[in-house]
Amino acid sequence: GILPEFGHNGLIENNILSEIEDAAIYVGMSDYIDVRNNQVFDNVAGIEVENSRHVLVEGNVARNNTGGILVFITPGLPIKSSYDAIVRRNFVTNNNTPNFAIPGSLVAGIPSGTGILVMSGDKVVIEDNIITGNNTGGIIVTSGDFVTEVASDKDSDPHSDQVEIRNNVMFDNGNDPDGEMKLLMLSKLSTKGPDILAYQSATKKERGSCISRREAYRSYGLEEWEDCDAPTVRAADAVASASDIGTTR
């Protein structure tokens, strides 16, 4: 795959990657990175943003992976935060490949059927994506409290705060939930998973998240989420200059 670490002001564009037992595109401990117009399929993770800041993931096709697009904090790394990521205008479809990651790796815990997953990431905007056919769930936002290693890293905040979900087209998600999601849905007297799921930690310390058009989605766990106001300019938007390749952010 493509695995930049400790990068600054980078661009990953126009690649086709498949059959990788980790992430096809991995952005680790980096700042101001654009991931644009790539195709990733038949991998464990399509695109993974780990412990990175000011990242734009735009115009990609993530299909037939275990998980399509991930924004993570992994414990024990020199950079302890992951914030200000924009995930927009991507096609995230049919990410139902059985997980074939190396046992013990963090991505080995990704449920098959995951569209977009945010774990412990802050200030993540998920907007204007088409998210369809992901059997466990379209968007899952969770706390690292559910992962022992994240919860035990005292320098990492395990909570996903200030997540914004705006104006995504979502349908045909949650048809065959995997693992714990299936048990959760059964506890709610349902066999179908959600378009959007937010797991709160036991301490309920997650703060400041919002969603637009919530009535359009099948969702669970968004009771504490606010309705989003009009969008604001984010730091990652300021990275582009007028010379960027034919796009205006």
PLM regions and their residue ranges:
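N-terminal secretory signal peptides
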Residues: 105-106, 198
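Loop/turn-rich, solvent-exposed surfaces of beta-rich toroidal or solenoidal domains
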Residues: 114, 120-121
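Short, recurring structural edge motifs at helix starts
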Residues: 1, 47, 73-78, 113-115, ...
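Short glycine/acidic-rich loop motifs that flank beta-strands on beta-rich extracellular proteins
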Residues: 1-5, 21-29, 44-51, 66-73, ...
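Short, catalytically relevant binding-site loops at active-site mouths
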Residues: 54, 75-78, 122-123, 138, ...
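Acidic, glycine- and Ser/Thr-rich low-complexity intrinsically disordered tracts
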Residues: 147, 151-249
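Right-handed parallel beta-helix
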Residues: 8-23, 31-45, 53-67, 81-96, ...
